[in-house]
UniProtKB/Swiss-Prot annotation:
Entry keyword set: ATP-binding, Kinase, Magnesium, Metal-binding, Nucleotide-binding, Thiamine biosynthesis, Transferase
UniProt similarity note: Belongs to the Thz kinase family.
BP terms from Gene Ontology: thiamine biosynthetic process; thiamine diphosphate biosynthetic process
SUPFAM superfamilies per UniProt: Ribokinase-like
Organism expressing this protein natively: Albidiferax ferrireducens (strain ATCC BAA-621 / DSM 15236 / T118) (Rhodoferax ferrireducens)
Pathway(s) the chain acts in: Cofactor biosynthesis; thiamine diphosphate biosynthesis; 4-methyl-5-(2-phosphoethyl)-thiazole from 5-(2-hydroxyethyl)-4-methylthiazole: step 1/1
Protein name, per record: Hydroxyethylthiazole kinase
Reported function: Catalyzes the phosphorylation of the hydroxyl group of 4-methyl-5-beta-hydroxyethylthiazole (THZ).
Organism superkingdom: Bacteria
Binding site for substrate: 49, 199
Family matches, as CDD domains: THZ_kinase
Pfam families attached to this UniProt entry: HK
Record: residues binding ATP: 125, 171
Gene: thiM
Length: 277
């Protein structure tokens, strides 16, 4: 039987984030800390970014979700992430991993494997090349950019789901969200300009953490988070272009629309297909 998911279900998760303001602990990369925090705030969540070994476990102890992003790696941060993973596993809170740049360097690949060996995440989100690399498939990554389409990574995503027994989200022109129950969602929202702002993908990962904090079904939470960002990106880009502005204005417009988006616009614009894989 095919999985079922109504647009109103997803909107109720958007409202839950706004109403409950979950605390999301992000150990993320230096490039995107500010934007990720603002995205979480605009969506209604509460961000905290702490990586000191002396406090990371305590911070996880008061958070409702943990987000790990390996964009700007160093040995200290890897150990911070491992400490956070152990604390999250002990508490049973959801963990979202963003393997930024997976496949680009041996060091990066080894760090990802260290994290996976420490504790398996609830959700892994990445572009096609990153997911293929984490799953052990051959893929060439250009920094944080993907050389593989999301559809090219579906086999790798399925393999990774089998390993983590969780959710894998492959971002691209079409976003694919798969889980161990063989549910498969495809989202076709968004705008090409979103790829020209640093941190949008990383912010998607942060949003997934916020949604997992309020929705125990991690697959549904991931679909809701990606749906929200896709629709918001579409609406924001159209408004910015209509004003004759560029991608700098889009960054601010994204935050505005995250706060202001209404149910009617969300459900009217959402392009979602749900099936089994």
């Amino acid at each position: 039987m095919a999985a079922k998911l109504s647009f109103s279900d997803l909107w109720s998760d958007v409202c839950a984030v706004r109403d409950r303001s979950p605390l999301v602990h992000s150990i993320t990369n230096l490039v995107v800390i500010n934007f990720n925090a603002n995205v979480l705030l605009a969506a209604g969540a509460s961000p905290v970014m702490a990586h000191a070994h002396e406090e990371v476990a305590d911070m996880v102890g008061i958070a409702q979700a943990l987000v790990l992003n390996i964009g700007t790696l160093d040995p200290y941060w890897i150990e911070s992430m491992q400490l956070a993973l152990r604390a999250a596993a002990k508490r049973g809170i959801p963990v979202v991993l963003d393997p930024v740049g997976a496949g680009a360097t041996k060091y990066r690949n080894e760090a990802i494997e260290q994290l996976l060996m420490t504790s398996l995440p609830t959700v892994v989100r990445g572009n096609g090349s990153e997911i293929m690399s984490v799953a052990g498939s051959a893929a060439q990554t250009r920094g944080v950019d993907s050389s593989a389409a999301a559809t090219d990574a579906l086999g790798a995503a399925q393999s990774l789901v089998q390993r983590t027994q969780g959710v894998v989200c492959v971002s691209g022109q079409i976003d694919h969200i798969l889980d161990a129950s063989h549910r498969w969602a495809q989202l076709s929202n968004g705008h090409a300009w979103m790829t020209r702002i640093t941190g949008v993908g990383c912010s998607a990962t942060a949003l997934i953490g916020a949604f997992c904090a309020v929705q125990p079904d991690a697959w549904r939470a991931t679909v809701a988070a990606m749906a929200l960002l896709g629709v918001v990106g579409e609406v924001a880009a159209e408004k910015v272009i209509a004003r004759g502005k560029g991608v700098g204005s889009l960054q601010m417009a994204l935050l505005d629309e995250l706060q202001l988006l209404d149910q009617g616009t969300f459900e009217q614009r959402l392009k979602l297909e749900v099936a089994q894989w």
